[in-house]
Amino acid sequence: MSERKAVIKNADMPEDMQQDAVDCATQALEKFNIEKDIAAYIKKEFDKKYNPTWHCIVGRNFGSYVTHETKHFIYFYLGQVAVLLFKSG
């Protein structure tokens, strides 16, 4: 599988957690092909590791406007796929 370059577009999150998000998304993309399944994997992993409630959107073309808890937001690309991950609630 080709190496996907991670490009962080926007983040309000500690750097170690950002790296976790990229690593988790990389694992998800290796395991799943359907964007919904990729998002579910990332969300569930972050719920386990950093406590609920995380939300994750994965896709190639979407807009967003969300409210998130301080220091719990990241938006990045992994290759052609965008990942929006944030904690709210």
Curated annotation (Swiss-Prot):
The keyword Cytoplasm applies. One of its GO terms (molecular function) is dynein intermediate chain binding. It holds the Pfam family Dynein_light. Its main location: cytoplasm. GO terms for biological process: intraciliary retrograde transport; motile cilium assembly. SMART domains: Dynein_light. InterPro entries: DLC_sf, Dynein_light_1/2_CS, Dynein_light_chain_typ-1/2. It is found in: Cytoplasm, Cytoskeleton, Flagellum axoneme. GO terms for cellular component: cytoplasm; cytoplasmic dynein complex; microtubule; motile cilium. Keywords: Cell projection, Cilium, Cytoplasm, Cytoskeleton, Dynein, Flagellum, Microtubule, Motor protein. Consists of at least 3 heavy chains (alpha, beta and gamma), 2 intermediate chains and 8 light chains. Belongs to the dynein light chain family. This is Dynein light chain LC6, flagellar outer arm. It comes from Heliocidaris crassispina.
